[in-house]
UniProtKB/Swiss-Prot annotation:
One of its GO terms (biological process) is ribosomal large subunit biogenesis. The lineage of its organism: Eukaryota, Fungi, Dikarya, Ascomycota, Saccharomycotina. It is found in: Nucleus, Nucleolus. The keyword Nucleotide-binding does not apply. This is Nucleolar pre-ribosomal-associated protein 2. The gene is URB2. Pfam families: Urb2.
Amino acid sequence: MGDLTEELSIPDNAQDLSKLLRSTSTKPHQIAEIVSKFDKLETYFPKKEIFVLDLLIDRLNNGNLDDFKTSEHTWIIFTRLLDAINDPISIKKLLKKLKTVPVMIRTFFLWPKDKLLTRSVSFIKAFFAINDYLIVNFSVEESFQLLEHAINGLSSCPTTDFALSYLQDACNLTHVDNITTTDNKIATCYCKHMLLPSLRYFAQTKNSASSNQSFIRLSHFMGKFLLQPRIDYMKLNKKFVQENASEITDDMAYYYFATFVTFLSKDNFAQLEVIFTILGAKKPSLECRFLNLLSESKKTVSQEFLEALLLEMLASTDESGVLSLIPIILKLDIEVAIKHIFRLLELIQLENLNDPLFSSHIWDLIIQSHANARELSDFFAKINEYCSRKGPDSYFLINHPAYVKSITKQLFTLSSLQWKNLLQALLDQVNHDSTNRVPLYLIRICLEGLSEGASRATLDEVKPILSQVFTLESFNNSLQWDLKYHIMEVYDDIVPAEELEKIDYVLSSNIFDTTSADVEELFFYCFKLREYISFDLSDAKKKFMRHFEILDEERKSNLSYSVVSKFATLVNNNFTREQISSLIDSLLLNSTNLSSLLKNDDIFEETNITYALINKLASSYHQTFALEALIQIPIQCINKNVRVALINNLTCESFCLDSATRECLLHLLSSPTFKSNIETNFYELCEKTIMSPEMAISETGDEKKEIEDKISIFEKVWTNHLSQAKEPVSEKFLESGYDIVKQSMSLSNGDSKLIIAGFTIAKFLKPDNKHRDIQGMAISYAVKILENYSENFESETIPLFRISMSTLYKIITTGQGDISKHKSRILDIFSKIMLRYHSKKVYHAPEEQEMFLVHSLLTENKLEYIFAEYLNIEHTDKCDSALGFCLEESLKQGPDAFNRLLWNSAKSFSTISQPCAEKFVRVFIIMSKRIARDNNLGHHLFVIALLEAYTYCDIEKFGYKSYLLLFNAIKEFLVSKPWLFSQYCIEMLLPFCLKTLAFIVNHESTDEINEGFINIIEVIDHMLLVHRFKFSNRHHLFNSVLCQILEIIAIHDGTLCANSADAVARLITNYCEPYNVSNAQNGQKNNLSSKISLIKQSIRKNVLVVLTKYIQLSITTQFSLNIKKSLQPGIHAIFDILSQNELNQLNAFLDTPGKQYFKALYLQYKKVGKWRED
């Protein structure tokens, strides 16, 4: 504001004062100071306000005194003087002297951008005050000039809301919205002043275009003043681009083209092509984005244009342009891919080595285009021709698995007749020239497609054609074996007797040596044929193994996987153990193949293979992949001796933190052997399976999970013995364990591992066990450890201290021990420890959590104290369980203490702050879960708590995660505890949901917005599904909620995703299709149906409001295509319940654009949304 550095000396007489004010050296802030002291002036100065106003008008009219226009003091004084003068006639006379329009335009132009950051726009208020006295007329050009300067300031506005307000004020001042007709002169003026600043703002805006209302407003201006049928916008566009080429950036050009795409109809594709060409010539790098935009908006251009563009790209030396544009061109028009397939295939072959991903993408698009055009059979003819002409270099197109997969997944589009004609044509070609491998590859592709998804009828129809493969003459191509094998994979009974008789010839000839290139297919053929008839496989096995041994490691692994997975039974029953062992050795070289094999449970039926596999894995126990594989093998398949050896090997060294080792041990111990070292020797078990306290704590610190929460190998072995405690071997082991831990805990400094073992054993002691005293010893020892820590505070004592507290908590909560005699001692110890922590200002989160668990059991009837303590520690799931346990124990004494805590929690919503909000919400949820049905006061307090949350919470003090937790809980309670929700509560939840939606969409990131939006919509959905009867006479509430939700989607279209719109569509559908209706009063069979009919009749009268809102938003805001598609089922559900009478009412209510949109919407519903019997 330009504060004075020293106070201005004000004259004490009117003459000098007026002279000071009139002085050209007097600055605006000095005039402001004088005016602010008018009330204190003792000098007689009549009409001083009129004098100063006249002076300001003179200064504003002076083109050399721009500092008056840019000073806030000027406009603040101006407004204040207008309010101070009580003579409207005098004001009008003065204001007529003001060159209002030029001053306004000049002020918008000069106003400092840094003042917009502080939302300081005092001049606008003054301008509106002037409008109260005078009618300010702007010419079209003057309006556009002022808006030009206003738009230039938008990017400096701190928020999008403020930017919209600033722009709207400028529009209101100029009355630009009153310009109803547009001609070439107005359009030229718009291009001169407003178009470039608008594009500049589009490029600078950081918010999503679809949710930025200023963006939408400026786009509307472009459509209104430029893109009108009576305007030669093509000429203006060309001139604008030429004149401003140096200033138009890539983003500006993109948004410029995007606006043309938005406002021009599908019939204007010729104009779009011209604009594309003009902008593309200036910004070639944007052509890809332009095409993407056309694809996303479902706007197209002519096939000729796309063809010319494709040919240009294919001839281009700019490889990046080719790679980026071609896929989009092919997506826009399938005919382009079909027509230019050979040029595209050459491109694929050329780029395959340099950019295989690009090549495969183009390949997919070519196939997709032919499939969509129902010309897949023609594609086979074209690829046959191309590969036959190009030779082996092109065979990857029909032989590489990825390329083949692209074809096979589209073969379902072929009809039975097409299948027959295609296969017959390929077989005729093979019969004519069996040396050409191309038709054989194509037949194999067809066979893969048949095996994947062809109908039984199709398979039966093509079977006679495929059977010709076995009878073809002059079939010398070595690929024949692969082809016959694949046919046998599709059909079980297709092999003719003559083919079966050939096997002796095949096995005895030198064919295995002469077809080395495809010998594996020949072996597969022989193995498959062996499943049809019995013959001696010895020679084939020898030749197969001889071939197998000469392969490199990778091919060995792949071949062994293929053979074992395809012919498991044959390999199991016919190969020797040495041969199977060799295959398994190679198979284990590839962990991916191994994992795939183990996913098929049938392999475990083959005993020889399973035996070899387990032995190989057991001998590789030091490798992680072997342990992970062993876990996948059913324990019944692993021999007991192998399990014993494995357990001993895995525990031969000190305990390892490797999770795979632990998981494997637990898997092996799921069927106990009672013979391994750790199962027969208690010392060995403790030494090899119990972590030292230091290791346990270090691991829990890394994984944020306590060791006791994990599966314990020690516990597994111990409980295995407990399950057969009367067996001699287990009885001896258990007695040994009891004696050892008793002896260790009787010492003042026992072995830490044995102490931990004693703590574990104490949890499993039954009341009638003669060693029950171990529990008392464990509790006493744990207390002694706590006391030792409180006295020494040595870091090495922390691990055992934490484990001791965890043990105490588990023993007490499971009812296995009495801690009452140690209560006061433990409380004193905790007080001592916490005082030490606070005095040293050291934070010990894990220790405090463990102390909280034990403390929660010792402070009886002090729920508020425990819950307050909970809010001051770091949260874990264990702490939640402790709170729940405390509440349940308290409720056994009655609900009074519980209700008092619930009341305090409810009233605390008004004072909650974000640091502890999430934990506070957890507290409220834990309590709410334990409100009993007969606790009427608890029901009331629950409603009060939700009301307090609705009234006082916002996103900044409450936090997004807290909201998510609360609404997830509400959603759960709506179903599990419906009696908690009164009529008042349900009606209050609706605005609570809307308030929360508004907070989330305006303050969170995109992912969080969508997650929160869906969550809250599901809450409303649950309210409707479970509590619909409470809305019997409240449909107007639900209509209002749905309308506001649709508005939120429209405003935040670019932020909210299709999943969010899907949730809204489900909500609307459930609203229109009631099915959860109580029928307790009448048991008649047709009563439920009549109730649903009555509800639908009531909804039908009210739901028109929702449909009207959707139509209005679709016209004014324009939902994106994805959002509109997702909302469609909900809109169709509304149409489902409307009668012709309601449709007529709606049509009469709508304006002309609304009627047109409604008609199109209804036609779409009848076409794709309305249920039909066919």
